[in-house]
Amino acid sequence: MSSNEGGAWLALNIRGKLAALLNVFELDKRQNAKSRGYLVKNFVKGNSSTLEYLQELQGSQDVYNGFKLITINISKKSLETHYFTNFVQDEGPALKHIQNGVQGFGNGPFLKVAEGEKLFNDIVKKYGHSNHKDTLIKELLRFLKWNKLHYPDEELIKRTPKFPGTDDQKKFSSIFVEMPSRQYGTRTHTIILIDHDGKVEYNEWTKSGLIWNHQCYTTILKAEV
């Protein structure tokens, strides 16, 4: 998934390297900061491991506005995941190894992240088998379009002072964000399925006007076993 600045928010290559980038809500942004989109692109195109890449990044973290970056190396026998944030308010700068299992990440430590992680876990437990692939995709897409408001959320209120008590502030509290009056909101959904044989199904829905366009790609990972 590409960003407007030539980088990417999410990327996966056939060697099993995956990266996802989240911006964070922050009150004070750096002027002339470097584009964060290249953090994803450079990891996927490079040869560094998840840990090596983030360790290298630690030395230049201050030239970017706030972000969270998840890097994953996937093989048929293992999954290596690391997480880095340069945002001090979220206990950063922090570099962590992530254990296998269900993990939820968001633009901040919001209620919708915790509730979303629970619902995601329930869906995967119920449908996370190859026999239920179509149902799994359907339920995950429904989850990504979940517009329930998790409000009031004290952390969200603290980080969105420009919208005190407004409907827009409340709309930030849902998984699926939609603000037509501001031409702002969720524009892309991505679901990536990888089985034990390295077969990949990459589904992406992107909003264009009022239409959601769906693209599906399949491939096989060439990661080392």
Regions found by a protein language model. Name each.
Residues M1-V225:
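N-terminal nucleophile
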